Amino acid sequence: MKIEEVKSTVRTQRIAAHSHVKGLGLDEVGAAVHSAAGLVGQKAAREAAGIVVDLIKSKKMAGRALLLAGPPGTGKTAIALAIAQELGNKVPFCPMVGSEVFSNEIKKTEVLMENFRRSIGLRIRETKEVYEGEVTELTPVETENPMGGYGKTISNVVIGLKTAKGTKQLKLDPSIFDALQKEKVEVGDVIYIEANSGAVKRQGRSDTFATEFDLETEEYVPLPKGDVHKKKEVIQDVTLHDLDVANARPQGGQDVLSMMGQLMKPKKTEITDKLRMEINKVVNKYIDQGIAELVPGVLFIDEIHMLDLETFTYLHKSLESPIAPIVIFATNRGRCVIRGTTDIVSPHGIPLDLLDRLLIIRTLLYSTADMEQIIKLRAQTEGLQLEENAFTRLSEIGTSSTLRYAVQLLTPAHQMCKVNGRNQISKDDIEDVHSLFLDAKRSSKHLSEKNNKFML
């Protein structure tokens, strides 16, 4: 006897820096719970983000921008990802970093526009008409070949369909006869035909014929209920960038050069403004007809100070365009020089005319108690066990250096405790890894003391 173990097909995901964030952690009235949904503290910032989520859901925020400003390690990216979690999968969320716009192949403004279009969804409602039932009659109607000769051509196909509620006789196009032959449809089969596309699907043999043969490989299906003619609404979610790409890549020809071109790695090309305008016209027509609905999503640009003056100017135009998403910026800079200039100093490295258009959410440094709670959350997410004094020591290290450094010490400390033959991470393990791995402040202090020993 052979016994096999069935392996799980559930996808295992890597534990990332923000795996523990599940939402904004707000109560029914929109007030922030101190520690909920993976977020700790930052009550004012989370409540402000909650108002933004409500505005996005009610479609009153499109074309506006938000800035998350605060020191490094204060949860700006975590709040942006929490907004994405609150909005759900149906609202497009496109994260990018400021330095992504710089490319040798395409312009900076093109990269920005691509991400803008990725952040705008289109929900298309399509009503599909389906004829479904058991085949009672299948008669191809032949006519003389109009091209002459002795052959005959099929002008149409008469097919009878039966359900539990009634019967219908249909006159179909000859192209559907080819599809019926491919599916090997016979009288007594249960099929459905899509009226819009002419697609035919054989579902199986009607179960009224189940007693015909002893040996049978057929799959028997019950007689369909309801009417023969049914209408079904199908909803598709696409982004405007998907439509741009689909129309920007025409299929190549059948000659050798075209086929060789398809085999080679295609170079990234820009999508023209003319094509985008044509797609916008079609989208607007669909919206006017009620076929489609525009879903403004969220574009999250981290490290916004990495953009230069040209891209900031382009952002003005993009934010004021009729089709624009909600844009969330994040930065950890104070007053600094705007990239692309030599002497223009501005708050957060953003031009003042763009800052004037933004709603700014401030994030504050965490207290020692908040840091301890965040470290506990991370340890729980990573499946690590720590003694209470180890948590206290880590929060002290986080206060003196950074929260990121304290969280990064968790995994090496777990390895150290395994080497020492324990399951729980102790304060001694934390001290050991703290002495082995330097943080940025201690490293820079060491560098300034031994500056003459390093190469210039």
Swiss-Prot record:
Keyword Cell cycle included in the entry's annotation: yes
Pfam families in UniProt: TIP49, TIP49_C
Record's subcellular location: Nucleus
A GO cellular component entry from the record: nucleus
One record GO biological process: regulation of transcription by RNA polymerase II
EC code(s) of this entry: 3.6.4.12
SMART domains from the UniProt entry: AAA (SM00382)
Subunit structure, as described in the record: Forms homohexameric rings. May form a dodecamer with rept made of two stacked hexameric rings. Component of the chromatin remodeling Ino80 complex. Interacts with Myc and rept.
Protein family membership: Belongs to the RuvB family.
Protein name in the entry: RuvB-like helicase 1
Gene for this chain: pont
